[in-house]
Regions:
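Short coil/loop linkers at secondary-structure junctions
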Residues: 25, 82, 175-178, 198
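Conserved residues at the C-terminal ends of beta-strands
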Residues: 60, 162, 203
Length: 205
């Protein structure tokens, strides 16, 4: 298998952590790719993902799996199933719903990054950027109060949440999430004890 990814992508980090935790990391070849709004990458769009998003998992038969959650679920299935994503029952739907929130938080944070760094300064839309940041911030508040998510055995929600917090450090270093959300701070410190989390930290901004 080959994973098209960027070391800076929180979505790709989620897949990398999942692969390590599932014991599959040695079965994946990592291929660095660059996708930037407004910049052409026709080869990636035509050959890998028309949406021009990372990561993408290219299987040995040439087929492609896109979306970080779908890739993580595929890897979980390869590892026997039910390890990071519950196989059935109410727990499965809680995990899928919580992960959808995390995915939306990361989407909003990425849009804030693009608004500031990619969009021409004269077109910057402050209210739109603030609205998207608030979605991520209120999402953090929700998880800060969720003792179950913060304390249960490792799953894809916890992996996704630590990627949210890591991306906040990477791209929004002065946002103050540790001061605002002490339970998330303790959770992040505990998660950083895992090798999979430590070695996947984004490069210095």
């Amino acid at each position: 298998m080959k994973l098209s990814y960027s070391p800076a992508s929180p979505f790709a980090r989620k897949v990398r952590v999942a692969a390590i935790e599932l014991g599959l990391i040695d079965k994946i070849e990592f291929i660095s790719a660059k996708v930037t709004p407004g910049e052409a990458n026709d080869a990636y769009m035509h050959d890998v993902n028309p949406l021009k998003k990372l990561p993408a998992l290219i299987l040995d038969d040439g087929s492609v799996i896109i979306d970080s959650y779908v890739i993580a679920e595929y890897l979980d299935d390869l590892a026997g199933g039910g390890k990071l994503i519950p196989a059935s029952g109410p727990a499965r739907w809680r995990v899928k719903s919580d992960h959808s929130l995390i995915q939306g938080m990361l989407d909003s944070m990425l849009l804030c990054r693009y608004e500031k760094m990619v969009r021409p300064k004269e077109l910057f839309w402050q209210a739109w950027s603030d609205d998207h940041w608030n979605r991520a911030w209120v999402g953090m508040a929700k998880f800060n109060k969720d003792a179950d998510v913060l304390s249960r055995d490792l799953d894809i929600v916890q992996i996704g949440l630590v990627c949210v917090l890591g991306y906040a450090d990477f791209r929004f270093g002065d946002c103050g999430w540790r001061e605002a959300y002490p339970n998330l701070k303790a959770f992040h410190e505990r998660m950083m004890q895992r090798e999979s989390i430590r070695i996947s930290v984004p490069p210095t901004a």
